[in-house]
């Protein structure tokens, strides 16, 4: 195959790692393929003084990448799946989901070993509504302070003494070589992960069969089933980053367990449900779990 493939990517260290990972995988499969990274600065990267929920959500991290594909400047875009909104413009589709890295959240601190180890009124940095909600349940005494920026920026703020601890995704830390900074992998029962956390997705033009065939070898089937279930739940709930929604699927012997969570930071109300079934029913299970949460009052919580 003699072809050039252009990958649209954000310019953060983690985004570049992910794009480079896809580039390396493809070049190994297709020795005659030339892969070029098209580095793009998105609005989400530029606006760092406001929380994502106030400036338009996680779609701000991918819109410019989609425009690059539409204009023919790029062929595909590589994303962290947790940054991909539940609604994708009809001109695009997810062509591949790669094998997931550790999907859990990480407790990172220079002085304390876990959330439980933090002193009263300790300062904890995070900008995630989902993390804030769950932190307030297990440690209502903590001072939770908004923290934006890439992984390196957040770690520097911790090292400069602005926080006693910060919460990040394990996957990003591991991929960037900061796995040793993880003091605690926060257990699922304390902090349910974000929908799609730890997975890399490739977005392409809708019905682009040539590109679809090209990236097909990168698809991880088990991760795909998990993400399909999680995203189906999120889509049915119409959950964005402005509301605390968590979704986490596991697979064992082709049986999927999906846990979903919806909450309200102000009232402290949390709804949490599980559903089980065969992986072939991943999307249906996600919708059914969302409907169970809706029956419990999830829509009212999300409206608030």
Swiss-Prot record:
One of its GO terms (molecular function) is hydroxymethylbilane synthase activity. Transmembrane segments: none annotated. Pathway: Porphyrin-containing compound metabolism; protoporphyrin-IX biosynthesis; coproporphyrinogen-III from 5-aminolevulinate: step 2/4. The modification S-(dipyrrolylmethanemethyl)cysteine is found at residue 241. It catalyses: 4 porphobilinogen + H2O = hydroxymethylbilane + 4 NH4(+). Its EC number is 2.5.1.61. GO terms for cellular component: cytoplasm. Binds 1 dipyrromethane group covalently. It is an enzyme of class 2 (transferase). Keywords: Porphyrin biosynthesis, Transferase. The keyword Oxidoreductase does not apply. InterPro entries: HemC, Porphobilin_deaminase_cofac_BS, Porphobilin_deaminase_N, Porphobilinogen_deaminase_C, Porphobilinogen_deaminase_C_sf. Its cofactor is dipyrromethane. GO terms for biological process: protoporphyrinogen IX biosynthetic process. PANTHER family: PORPHOBILINOGEN DEAMINASE. Tetrapolymerization of the monopyrrole PBG into the hydroxymethylbilane pre-uroporphyrinogen in several discrete steps. The porphobilinogen subunits are added to the dipyrromethane group. Belongs to the HMBS family. Monomer. This is Porphobilinogen deaminase. It comes from Vesicomyosocius okutanii subsp. Calyptogena okutanii (strain HA). The gene is hemC.
